[in-house]
């Protein structure tokens, strides 16, 4: 179920559900199927999945009672993937569902830093000003976390 969710394959998710798969399953690090569907562990260019497909997968999981508000053992939640990828419709949906806009990962990244190009992922990340502004509008504190420069993990965005 996690693999199907991570590629937002709604058809396969429905097949697995019909066969008894648990939509609330999590990884060892507590990543949920919703986190997988919101591209928590994907960088730009790693997947051909579209934001619309991700929204369809997330909506299916929400209809099955999967809680969108969880955090992994490293402190990431369902806002990080959309913030990194520039999926602002999905980002807004997760914010509206009450996902913590001020989550701070063990690497010092927040959803705001991820959107602003200051996250801890090397390569394949964009500067998502609209997403960063959306997060601030909903209470994100830009002072939280640690900029990638202090981690020596910045991408060359030039």
Model regions and ranges:
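Ankyrin repeat A-helix N-terminal signature
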Residues: 3-9, 36-54, 81-88, 114-128
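Extended amphipathic secondary-structure runs
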Residues: 1-20, 26, 71-73, 80
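Terminal, low-structured helical/coil segments at or just beyond the last alpha-helical repeat
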Residues: 122, 127-158
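Ankyrin repeat domain, specifically the short helix-to-loop turn at the C-terminus of the second helix
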Residues: 14-22, 56-67, 92-100, 133-141
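Amphipathic alpha-helical segments in well-structured domains
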Residues: 30, 54-55, 108-109, 128-132
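Ankyrin-repeat boundary/"N-cap" motif
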Residues: 1, 26-43, 71-78, 104-119, ...
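Eukaryotic tandem repeat interaction scaffolds
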Residues: 28-31, 50-59, 72-76, 80, ...
